Regions:
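N-terminal alpha/beta PP-like core and its mobile active-site loop of ThDP/TPP-dependent enzymes
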Residues: 1-200
Length: 200
Protein backbone atom coordinates (compact mmCIF):
# COMPACT_ATOMS: atom_id res chain seq x y z
CA UNK A 1 0.00 0.00 0.00
CA UNK A 2 1.38 3.40 -0.98
CA UNK A 3 -0.04 6.40 0.84
CA UNK A 4 0.64 10.10 1.19
CA UNK A 5 0.75 11.73 4.62
CA UNK A 6 1.28 15.10 6.28
CA UNK A 7 4.67 16.76 6.32
CA UNK A 8 7.24 15.11 8.55
CA UNK A 9 7.82 18.04 10.91
CA UNK A 10 4.08 18.26 11.60
CA UNK A 11 3.78 14.52 12.22
CA UNK A 12 6.94 14.30 14.33
CA UNK A 13 5.86 17.16 16.59
CA UNK A 14 2.26 15.87 16.80
CA UNK A 15 0.98 19.32 15.87
CA UNK A 16 -2.37 17.97 14.74
CA UNK A 17 -2.45 18.78 11.04
CA UNK A 18 -5.72 18.18 9.17
CA UNK A 19 -5.93 14.39 8.85
CA UNK A 20 -2.40 14.37 10.28
CA UNK A 21 -2.35 10.89 11.74
CA UNK A 22 1.11 9.34 12.00
CA UNK A 23 0.19 6.75 9.39
CA UNK A 24 3.63 5.14 9.32
CA UNK A 25 3.55 4.17 12.99
CA UNK A 26 -0.16 3.38 12.84
CA UNK A 27 0.40 0.91 9.98
CA UNK A 28 3.38 -0.93 11.54
CA UNK A 29 1.43 -3.43 13.67
CA UNK A 30 -0.84 -4.41 10.78
CA UNK A 31 1.61 -5.18 8.00
CA UNK A 32 4.74 -7.18 7.37
CA UNK A 33 6.86 -4.03 7.16
CA UNK A 34 6.37 -0.26 6.92
CA UNK A 35 8.74 2.15 5.16
CA UNK A 36 8.79 5.96 4.96
CA UNK A 37 10.41 7.86 2.08
CA UNK A 38 12.02 11.14 3.15
CA UNK A 39 13.83 12.06 -0.07
CA UNK A 40 12.50 11.95 -3.62
CA UNK A 41 15.70 10.32 -4.88
CA UNK A 42 15.05 7.36 -2.57
CA UNK A 43 11.65 6.60 -4.12
CA UNK A 44 12.88 3.87 -6.48
CA UNK A 45 14.82 2.10 -3.74
CA UNK A 46 11.85 2.30 -1.38
CA UNK A 47 9.44 0.80 -3.92
CA UNK A 48 11.92 -1.97 -4.82
CA UNK A 49 12.48 -2.73 -1.12
CA UNK A 50 8.72 -2.79 -0.46
CA UNK A 51 8.07 -5.21 -3.33
CA UNK A 52 10.90 -7.52 -2.28
CA UNK A 53 9.69 -7.54 1.32
CA UNK A 54 6.10 -8.23 0.27
CA UNK A 55 6.93 -11.29 -1.82
CA UNK A 56 9.95 -12.73 0.02
CA UNK A 57 9.55 -15.49 2.59
CA UNK A 58 5.97 -15.54 3.79
CA UNK A 59 4.14 -13.01 1.58
CA UNK A 60 2.55 -10.07 3.35
CA UNK A 61 1.31 -6.52 2.99
CA UNK A 62 3.83 -3.67 3.06
CA UNK A 63 3.03 -0.02 3.79
CA UNK A 64 4.98 2.74 2.02
CA UNK A 65 4.50 6.22 3.51
CA UNK A 66 5.31 9.27 1.38
CA UNK A 67 5.03 12.51 3.37
CA UNK A 68 3.76 15.66 1.64
CA UNK A 69 7.16 17.36 1.76
CA UNK A 70 8.67 14.39 -0.11
CA UNK A 71 5.93 14.42 -2.76
CA UNK A 72 6.64 18.06 -3.69
CA UNK A 73 10.43 17.67 -3.88
CA UNK A 74 11.92 18.24 -7.31
CA UNK A 75 14.38 15.88 -8.90
CA UNK A 76 16.50 16.03 -12.03
CA UNK A 77 16.09 13.42 -14.74
CA UNK A 78 19.53 12.01 -13.90
CA UNK A 79 18.67 11.67 -10.21
CA UNK A 80 15.34 10.07 -11.05
CA UNK A 81 16.90 7.54 -13.41
CA UNK A 82 19.58 6.74 -10.84
CA UNK A 83 16.81 5.90 -8.36
CA UNK A 84 15.14 3.31 -10.61
CA UNK A 85 15.96 -0.23 -9.52
CA UNK A 86 15.38 -3.37 -11.50
CA UNK A 87 14.13 -6.12 -9.24
CA UNK A 88 16.24 -9.22 -9.73
CA UNK A 89 14.73 -12.35 -8.22
CA UNK A 90 12.50 -10.50 -5.72
CA UNK A 91 11.66 -13.74 -3.93
CA UNK A 92 14.70 -16.02 -3.85
CA UNK A 93 13.83 -19.68 -3.62
CA UNK A 94 14.70 -21.63 -0.52
CA UNK A 95 16.22 -24.97 -1.42
CA UNK A 96 16.26 -27.79 1.15
CA UNK A 97 19.47 -29.72 1.63
CA UNK A 98 20.01 -33.16 0.10
CA UNK A 99 19.56 -34.98 3.40
CA UNK A 100 16.14 -33.42 3.98
CA UNK A 101 15.06 -34.34 0.46
CA UNK A 102 16.25 -37.92 0.94
CA UNK A 103 14.30 -38.26 4.22
CA UNK A 104 11.17 -36.88 2.56
CA UNK A 105 11.47 -39.29 -0.38
CA UNK A 106 11.90 -42.25 1.99
CA UNK A 107 8.84 -41.21 4.00
CA UNK A 108 6.71 -40.92 0.87
CA UNK A 109 7.98 -44.22 -0.61
CA UNK A 110 7.16 -46.12 2.59
CA UNK A 111 3.79 -44.49 3.18
CA UNK A 112 0.75 -46.78 3.24
CA UNK A 113 -1.85 -44.00 2.97
CA UNK A 114 -0.19 -40.79 1.82
CA UNK A 115 -2.13 -37.58 1.22
CA UNK A 116 -1.21 -34.32 -0.51
CA UNK A 117 -2.67 -31.08 0.87
CA UNK A 118 -2.58 -28.15 -1.56
CA UNK A 119 -2.72 -24.60 -0.19
CA UNK A 120 -2.85 -21.09 -1.57
CA UNK A 121 0.95 -20.88 -1.72
CA UNK A 122 0.88 -23.52 -4.45
CA UNK A 123 -1.67 -21.42 -6.34
CA UNK A 124 0.28 -18.17 -5.88
CA UNK A 125 3.40 -19.90 -7.20
CA UNK A 126 1.44 -21.20 -10.23
CA UNK A 127 2.46 -24.81 -9.70
CA UNK A 128 -0.43 -26.39 -11.64
CA UNK A 129 1.78 -28.44 -13.95
CA UNK A 130 4.07 -29.65 -11.18
CA UNK A 131 1.32 -30.75 -8.79
CA UNK A 132 -0.67 -32.36 -11.60
CA UNK A 133 2.45 -34.30 -12.61
CA UNK A 134 3.17 -35.28 -9.00
CA UNK A 135 -0.35 -36.63 -8.49
CA UNK A 136 -0.42 -38.39 -11.88
CA UNK A 137 2.93 -40.12 -11.35
CA UNK A 138 2.46 -41.11 -7.70
CA UNK A 139 -1.31 -41.73 -7.62
CA UNK A 140 -1.38 -40.00 -4.22
CA UNK A 141 -4.79 -38.53 -3.37
CA UNK A 142 -4.91 -34.78 -2.86
CA UNK A 143 -7.00 -32.40 -0.81
CA UNK A 144 -7.16 -28.78 -2.02
CA UNK A 145 -7.72 -25.96 0.45
CA UNK A 146 -10.24 -23.35 -0.71
CA UNK A 147 -7.65 -21.04 -2.33
CA UNK A 148 -5.99 -23.96 -4.15
CA UNK A 149 -9.10 -25.28 -5.86
CA UNK A 150 -8.53 -25.56 -9.59
CA UNK A 151 -4.84 -26.47 -9.46
CA UNK A 152 -6.04 -29.98 -10.24
CA UNK A 153 -9.57 -30.45 -11.61
CA UNK A 154 -12.17 -31.29 -8.95
CA UNK A 155 -13.34 -34.29 -10.97
CA UNK A 156 -9.90 -35.92 -10.78
CA UNK A 157 -10.12 -39.53 -9.54
CA UNK A 158 -7.37 -38.60 -7.05
CA UNK A 159 -9.40 -35.86 -5.37
CA UNK A 160 -10.10 -36.59 -1.70
CA UNK A 161 -12.30 -33.52 -1.24
CA UNK A 162 -15.48 -35.59 -0.87
CA UNK A 163 -13.88 -37.62 1.93
CA UNK A 164 -11.86 -34.86 3.61
CA UNK A 165 -12.27 -35.96 7.25
CA UNK A 166 -11.67 -39.63 6.48
CA UNK A 167 -8.59 -38.81 4.39
CA UNK A 168 -7.05 -36.64 7.10
CA UNK A 169 -7.69 -39.21 9.84
CA UNK A 170 -6.26 -42.12 7.85
CA UNK A 171 -3.20 -40.51 6.21
CA UNK A 172 0.09 -41.75 7.61
CA UNK A 173 2.20 -39.31 5.57
CA UNK A 174 0.88 -35.86 4.69
CA UNK A 175 2.64 -33.84 1.99
CA UNK A 176 1.79 -30.18 2.56
CA UNK A 177 2.37 -27.99 -0.49
CA UNK A 178 1.86 -24.25 -0.12
CA UNK A 179 -0.26 -24.51 3.02
CA UNK A 180 0.23 -23.88 6.71
CA UNK A 181 -0.92 -26.20 9.45
CA UNK A 182 -3.07 -23.50 11.03
CA UNK A 183 -6.57 -23.55 12.54
CA UNK A 184 -8.10 -24.59 9.20
CA UNK A 185 -6.13 -27.83 9.44
CA UNK A 186 -6.37 -28.21 13.24
CA UNK A 187 -2.65 -27.38 13.44
CA UNK A 188 -1.93 -30.91 12.15
CA UNK A 189 -3.13 -32.44 15.42
CA UNK A 190 -5.41 -35.33 16.35
CA UNK A 191 -8.29 -36.05 16.30
CA UNK A 192 -8.62 -34.46 12.84
CA UNK A 193 -5.30 -36.03 11.79
CA UNK A 194 -3.87 -39.46 12.46
CA UNK A 195 -1.89 -38.92 15.69
CA UNK A 196 1.05 -40.85 14.18
CA UNK A 197 1.05 -39.00 10.85
CA UNK A 198 4.32 -37.64 9.51
CA UNK A 199 4.36 -34.32 7.66
CA UNK A 200 6.47 -33.31 4.67
Amino acid sequence: MISGSSERHIIDLSQGDYEGLDQYNAAKPFCKKAYRVDRAEDMGLAVARAIRTAVSGRPGGVYLDIPADTIVQEDTADQSNFGVYKLVDPAPKQVPNDEAISRAVDLIKNAQKPLIILGKGAAYDQTEKQVQQLVAETNIPFLPMSMAKGLIPDDSPHSAAAARSLSLRNADVVIVIGARLNWMLSYGDAPQFNPHAKFV
